[in-house]
A protein has these predicted regions:
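Small beta-barrel nucleic-acid-binding modules, primarily SNase/OB-fold domains
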Residues: 1-344
């Protein structure tokens, strides 16, 4: 196994954040940091013990420019003792997703189409997750965020372009929550080029087990482009839990694109079917068997090819290797100049 730098952040998960009591779904949560010395630690490859690190203090991703000073604002990655975590390995059905209005030239504004849309089984997944977390007997559950980073990477490698920490959550009994969600069939596998080989292997094993679970939702995964249902919207916090039955759901990555496509077509901002939309976007990914052998030098394929994929998704979820968008964290330096954080 290749040597890595290990990052860990001790904190607590506030269970009240999850739907129906809150708005969090099954793959993005907020980890409430214990604001005390030693909460954020790193163990470099050549070290045997974890050491405190201040790499993330007052650091963040560049935001909008201040309209008064003209200086670029920094969106802190640790804000008021809280980090936002994107659970790596998984993609859960969308509990609330708004169409991406970029590129519509304002054509979506005022149309009433920008709403929080929802997928079938999103509620079921998060309700089952909360039921499991409640077995630990605390509404504020102690845990650790962990991320294994390549030695050539700096602190920014743990952060995605939205300022979220990307990694795993380890529960008090040592359970890896990310793998548990896959094993229970409560999420779809999502593999990225930033993941280490062993992480890919154990994720696939967990996903394959989860697809066999009769209690999970993975068995209801649908690789066909079902008709978009605009009546499925986010149900407000406090709503009663409903049985979603055996209604199938599309891969969340494709659903997000389908939601935006639908809004654009309704606003007459795009002419064509969903396949046309995907073809125009020309997003690319790697094929896992080839990526294992050649890494990022492997051929990149379009996310969708009408000729081969027809009205659905051509590969299995575990065949896709998606590219993690490059990100870095910065601080405001002298004179408001942005300075990249590269050292631990």
């Amino acid at each position: 196994m290749a040597k890595t730098n290990s990052l860990e952040i001790a904190g607590t998960i506030e269970l009240a954040q999850f739907w129906p009591n809150g708005k969090s779904d099954a793959d993005t949560t907020k980890l409430m940091l214990t604001v005390a010395p030693g909460s954020v630690r790193v163990k470099l490859a050549e070290q045997t013990q974890f050491q405190n690190t201040s790499a993330y203090e007052d650091a963040g991703i560049p935001g909008k420019k201040d309209t008064v000073t003209g200086q670029t604002k920094i969106e802190l990655v640790i804000k008021n003792g809280t980090i936002t975590v994107r659970l790596q390995r998984i993609d859960a059905p969308e509990l609330h997703y708004r169409p991406d209005a970029k590129g519509s030239d304002g054509k979506l504004k005022g149309t009433g189409l920008i709403k929080d849309y929802r997928q079938h089984q999103a509620e079921t997944a998060v309700v089952k997750l909360v039921a499991f977390l409640q077995t630990f007997g605390s509404s504020q559950l102690p845990c650790k965020f962990v991320s294994e980073l390549k030695t050539s990477e700096g602190p920014g490698a743990a952060i995605d372009k939205y300022g979220r920490f990307v990694g795993d959550i380890i529960l008090p009994d040592g359970t890896n929550l990310n793998l548990w969600l896959l094993e229970q069939g409560l999420a779809v596998i999502a593999l990225y080029d930033s993941m280490l080989p062993y992480e890919i292997d154990e994720s696939i094993a967990a996903w394959q087990a989860g697809r066999k679970s009769r209690e999970g939702i993975a068995r209801l995964y649908n690789d066909r482009f079902n008709k978009f249902d605009p009546t499925l919207e986010f149900r407000a916090v406090g709503s009663a839990v409903r049985d979603e039955g055996d209604r199938k759901f599309l891969h969340p990555k494709f659903y997000r694109r389908q939601t935006t496509w639908w809004a654009f077509t309704q606003a007459d901002a795009f002419k064509g079917d969903f396949a046309d939309w995907l073809t125009q976007k020309a997003e690319k990914c790697w094929y896992l068997p080839e990526f294992r052998e050649l890494g990022s030098k492997a051929t990149k394929y379009r996310l969708y090819e009408r000729e081969f994929d027809g009205d659905g998704i051509g590969w299995q979820p575990e065949d896709f290797i998606f590219a993690e968008s490059a990100s870095s964290i910065q601080r405001l330096g002298v004179g408001g100049k942005l300075v990249k954080v590269s050292d631990w």
